[in-house]
């Protein structure tokens, strides 16, 4: 892979922003020259190198978003430190050239070149120099700057990233880099993962698989940004304030020994024309092919930067590495890249720069993923053809963009709008389909400028091109040439993604996906189909599209979800970042190979399935498309858990020629406000659950009371019947006896009357008889009274028994009701406890 320095210089309107320019001293990192090919020693452990490469690229993807990249300036691109290139936040904070500072703390160009182990224009041979470099010297400087950056970084975003990373299970592949006690590995979240190479001299060296350079700026952007030059090592913190500039430790080479400037310069000049060395065994190359690094906006980054140690790429790598250290699992799916470059596009993109003439086919296959993922602005800056293309795009980008869109519309209407299977697979794994909505096509066709530059650039860069995106090789010789012009690319990041970025920020129902962006040109029919499947009750409304985009690209950040939350506002990115994302955005428009087109068709159903499988709380609030992740984003959320978090380990791409297949384990990201929305939806769910519990409790209580009342009623009826029977019996017996007594008394009276006549004779006898009758009557009365008293006592006992029975029934009913209420309260307490834990986890 030869780096054509002259071509790069020609491609750029100014040598200042030509990162490949070799007119600057090699000893100064700020002055980056592309094309240094460092012979890579065979001692580099392939397994670890590949693993760390994958992890690093994923970390780079998560760590490098438009927010953290400094706007490039005419001289700033050559003068800025690597961190400044990556994290120079807004346009106001353009890195300032500090050659002395950089030369002291940074590794030499070779060490920096090492970071570009496999980037466009970078040779794998550079790993040997990397292996030979000593790591310790920069550790202290890194720690120092790390402390500085830590103060400026908002802990919330880092904590959220870490949380999401854990949820996503990001430690699986990047466990080595993450578990490393090294401050470079852990403390600097933006620090990219480095491949561990066992160099002959340093023993174990970290070879940074730096992301593809993305700080190329059009002359217009440079002119607008020339005045602002921040310190040599400014990086934008991940906090919500994009203006915060952090000076992170120069850990690009992770303490590698700085080689002499002369040797570095020689390496640069020598490697400029050398093809990429094929030392790497085929397995190693395959591993690298499968490795894709993406920034938070899913900007593909090849597992390597230019070996010539360009200051812009080094700075980007360092800032990215800081993030990557904390978020090793941030494997951002380069969906658009996976299918965006065919073999021919790869050969065109990397004609002599990456592929030796005798092994160009082999290099195309082995580095197809790299070339596809690495077609970022930074790599373009180092690639002479990319520089030339950038220059050309400034002039004819609008015309090509118009033609491309016209052809795209026609092709999409013809049914040729096939998304690549890797892209759809990544879509499925991430569940991010917001960019393929019908609005996306509108955004692609409208080219409306957007105030949110980073969002626009991110969306446009992250978009997945359909085969129609590349109307023809003639119309767009290079995949990134289709829509570049200074107005769209450099100044406002307005490209097709701008409307989509607006959509991301304005459309609450859809969760923006970095993998899908405005460049995806899908027919209304396909868009509607995807919208129906992908945007149904998936994510909560009000999701910040730019945040969600960068956030979804981070598997660790769901949420979510499953959830890295980029705290920077979409409009905060600098024009440089915009143009860089535009430049990176270009490669994904290369025509899809037939295989990729077929894969795209096949992948759509599975993508929908995977996308739906990542729903966290979709049933909670379907209108809001809740994914209380991601809530797995996060929910993640969804999701955040956020789960919620269907988020998985970083995506690997299986590269076959120019086709990469993204693994279904692509983590899902969640926007920062995802937690709030998740909480709101959880509150809604809690309210519904509470209402349901209360309703059930009332129903059960009513049933219990009704049953108890029926039992009591029946019992009382029985008691009443028994009492009535006893009373009736007593009354009947009394009446009969009374009747007999009355008859007897009447007879006695009658006799008395008779005897009255015989008064004297029989008066005593009759009086005695009456007296006896009266006595008998009194005795009966006493007896009757005694019987009545007995029955009264019996009835009293019956009433007492009935009362006891009724009380027991009522007590039983109350006990049952209390148990029901207790269970309801217990459930509510459990739900509240789970909710608190969820809120605590998501808040962390």
Swiss-Prot record:
Tell me a GO biological process for this protein: homologous chromosome pairing at meiosis
User: Which residue intervals are annotated with compositional bias (Basic and acidic residues) in the record?
Assistant: 122-134, 145-164, 256-270, 324-363, 441-456, 616-640
Q: What is its main location?
A: nucleus
Q: Which InterPro entries match?
A: ASY3-like, ASY3-like_CC
Which residues pair up as cystines? none
Where does the protein end up?
Chromosome; Nucleus
Regarding tissue, the record states: Expressed in pollen mother cells and the ovule tissues during meiosis.
Bias-annotated ranges (Polar residues):
106-120, 191-208, 218-229, 364-382, 420-440, 545-554, 646-661
Stretches of Low complexity bias are at 459-473
Example of a GO cellular component annotation carried by this entry: nucleus
Q: Where is this region: Disordered?
A: 41-389, 418-506, 532-604, 616-669
> Gene deleted: what happens?
Sterility in both male and female gametes.
- Where, if anywhere, are coiled coils annotated? 731-765
Report keywords, A-Z. Answer: Chromosome, Coiled coil, Meiosis, Nucleus
Q: What function does the entry list?
A: Plays a crucial role in homologous chromosome pairing and synapsis in meiosis. Does not seem required for cytokinesis. Is essential for meiotic bouquet formation, homologous chromosome pairing and normal recombination, and synaptonemal complex (SC) assembly. Required for the proper association of PAIR2 with chromosomes.
- The protein in question is named Meiosis-specific protein PAIR3
């Amino acid at each position: 892979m030869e780096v054509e320095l002259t071509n790069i210089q020609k491609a750029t309107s100014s040598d200042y922003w030509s990162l490949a320019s070799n007119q600057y001293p090699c000893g100064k990192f700020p002055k980056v020259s592309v094309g240094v090919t460092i012979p890579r020693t065979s001692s580099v452990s392939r397994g670890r190198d590949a693993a760390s490469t994958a992890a690093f690229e994923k970390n780079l993807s998560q760590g490098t978003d438009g927010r953290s990249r400094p706007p490039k300036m005419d001289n700033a691109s050559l003068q800025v430190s690597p961190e400044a290139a990556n994290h120079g936040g807004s346009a106001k904070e353009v890195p300032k050239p500090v050659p002395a500072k950089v030369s002291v703390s940074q590794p030499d160009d070779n060490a920096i070149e090492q970071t570009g182990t496999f980037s466009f224009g970078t040779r794998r041979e550079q790993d040997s120099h990397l292996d030979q470099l000593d790591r310790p010297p920069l550790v202290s400087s890194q720690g120092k700057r790390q402390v500085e950056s830590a103060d400026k970084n908002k802990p919330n975003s880092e904590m959220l990233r870490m949380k999401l990373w854990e949820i996503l299970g990001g430690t699986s592949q990047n466990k080595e880099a993450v578990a490393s006690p090294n401050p470079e590995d852990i403390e600097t979240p933006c620090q990219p993962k480095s491949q561990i190479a066992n160099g002959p001299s340093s023993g174990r060296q970290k070879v940074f698989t730096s992301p593809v350079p993305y700080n190329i700026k059009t002359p217009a952007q440079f002119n607008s940004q020339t005045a602002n030059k921040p310190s040599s090592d400014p990086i934008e913190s991940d906090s919500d304030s994009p203006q915060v500039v952090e000076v992170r430790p120069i850990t690009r080479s992770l303490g590698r020994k700085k080689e002499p400037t002369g040797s570095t310069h020689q390496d640069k000049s020598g490697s400029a024309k050398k093809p990429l060395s094929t030392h790497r065994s085929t397995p190693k190359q395959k591993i690298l092919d499968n490795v894709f690094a993406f920034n938070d906006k899913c900007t593909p980054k090849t597992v390597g930067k230019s070996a010539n140690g360009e200051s812009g790429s080094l700075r980007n790598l360092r800032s990215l590495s800081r993030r990557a250290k904390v978020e090793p699992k941030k494997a951002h799916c380069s969906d658009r890249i996976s299918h965006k470059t065919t073999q021919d596009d790869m050969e065109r993109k990397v004609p002599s720069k990456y592929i030796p003439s005798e092994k160009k086919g082999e290099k195309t296959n082995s580095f197809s993923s790299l070339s596809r993922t690495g077609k970022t602005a930074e790599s373009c800056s180092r690639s002479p053809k990319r520089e030339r293309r950038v220059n050309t795009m400034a002039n004819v980008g609008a015309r090509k963009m118009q033609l491309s869109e016209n052809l795209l519309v026609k092709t999409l209407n013809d049914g040729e709008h096939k998304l690549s299977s890797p892209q759809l697979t990544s879509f499925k794994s991430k569940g991010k389909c917001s960019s393929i909505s019908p609005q996306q096509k509108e955004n692609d066709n409208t080219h409306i400028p957007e105030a949110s530059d980073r969002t626009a650039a991110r969306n446009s860069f992250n978009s997945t091109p359909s085969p129609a995106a590349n109307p023809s090789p003639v119309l767009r010789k290079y995949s990134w040439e289709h829509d570049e012009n200074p107005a769209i690319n450099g100044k406002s990041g307005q490209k097709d993604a701008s409307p989509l970025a607006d959509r991301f920020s304005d459309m609450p129902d859809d969760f923006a996906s970095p993998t899908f962006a405005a460049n995806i040109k899908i027919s209304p029919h396909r868009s509607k189909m995807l919208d129906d499947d992908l945007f149904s009750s998936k994510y909560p409304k009000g999701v910040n599209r730019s945040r969600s985009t960068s956030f979804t690209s981070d598997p660790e950040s769901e949420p979510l979800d499953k959830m890295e939350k980029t705290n920077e506002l979409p409009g905060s990115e600098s024009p440089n970042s915009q143009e860089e994302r535009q430049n990176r955005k270009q490669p994904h428009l290369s025509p899809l190979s037939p295989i990729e087109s077929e894969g795209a068709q096949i992948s759509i159903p599975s993508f929908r399935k995977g996308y739906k499988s990542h729903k966290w709380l979709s049933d909670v609030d379907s209108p809001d498309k809740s994914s209380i992740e991601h809530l797995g984003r996060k929910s993640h959320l969804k999701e955040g858990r956020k789960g919620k978090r269907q988020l998985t380990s970083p995506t690997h791409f299986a590269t076959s020629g120019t086709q990469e297949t993204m693994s279904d384990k692509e983590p899902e990201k969640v926007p920062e406000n995802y937690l709030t929305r998740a909480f709101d939806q959880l509150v809604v769910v809690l309210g519904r659950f509470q209402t349901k519990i209360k309703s059930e409790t009332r129903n059960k209580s009513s049933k219990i009371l009704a049953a108890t009342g029926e039992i009591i009623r029946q019992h009382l009826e029985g008691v009443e019947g028994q009492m009535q029977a006893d009373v009736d019996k007593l009354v009947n017996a009394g009446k009969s006896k009374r009747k007999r007594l009355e008859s007897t008394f009447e007879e006695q009276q009658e006799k008395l009357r008779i005897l009255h006549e015989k008064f004297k004779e029989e008066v005593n006898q009759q009086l005695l008889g009456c007296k006896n009758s009266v006595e008998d009557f009194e005795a009966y009365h006493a007896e009757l009274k005694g019987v009545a008293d007995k029955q009264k006592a019996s009835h009293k006992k019956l009433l007492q028994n009935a009362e006891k029975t009724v009380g027991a029934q009522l007590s039983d009913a109350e006990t049952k009701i209390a148990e029901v209420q207790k269970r309801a309260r217990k459930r509510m307490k459990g739900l509240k406890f789970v909710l608190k834990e969820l809120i605590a986890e998501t808040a962390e």
